[in-house]
């Protein structure tokens, strides 16, 4: 019984050959996603800090409900003072039982943020998402400053292509 090791260059070459024979662009993109997945970093696919939909820790419950009702996101970073200091992640589903209330201490429903460095490889990141059972990571630069966020959906889309949901 003989075993062999296939490296990424051989897979890339096989993909090039396959691309001439496969007519379906979705199939080609899927194969390309598999090949390039492990080479990409969190910073390659993250949503930059200027695009992060977030909530201030100082927001009232009414303001939070108003903001999430206008949002397409189910997990929202919460910051203190500015986006550089993310203190938690709010899961919209955690507020559903309290949505009819006029006032609620929503801060007690915050979840611990998960931080990763911008050079975190996607193949490692997807394993951490799975292990920690979370869907959102805050991406930090080399100085520890927030530079963006990346979701599990973003990582999966690198393999399978765009996932269209009710908000896309």
Where are these regions (language model features)?
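Soluble cytosolic regulatory domains appended to membrane proteins
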Residues: 4-168
């Amino acid at each position: 019984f003989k075993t062999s090791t296939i490296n990424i260059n051989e897979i890339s070459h096989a993909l090039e050959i396959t691309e001439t024979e496969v007519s379906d662009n979705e199939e080609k993109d899927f194969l390309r996603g598999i090949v390039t997945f492990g080479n990409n970093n969190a910073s390659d696919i993250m949503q930059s800090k200027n695009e992060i939909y977030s909530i201030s820790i100082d927001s009232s419950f009414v303001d939070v409900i108003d903001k999430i009702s206008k949002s397409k996101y189910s997990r929202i970073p919460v910051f203190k003072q500015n986006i550089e200091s993310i203190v938690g992640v709010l899961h919209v589903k955690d507020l559903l039982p309290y949505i009819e209330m006029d006032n609620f201490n929503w801060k007690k429903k915050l979840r611990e943020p998960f931080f990763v460095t911008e050079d975190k490889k996607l193949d490692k990141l997807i394993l951490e998402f799975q292990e920690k059972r979370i869907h959102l990571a805050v991406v930090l630069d080399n100085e520890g400053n927030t530079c963006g966020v990346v979701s599990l959906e973003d990582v999966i889309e690198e393999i399978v292509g765009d996932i269209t949901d009710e908000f896309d």
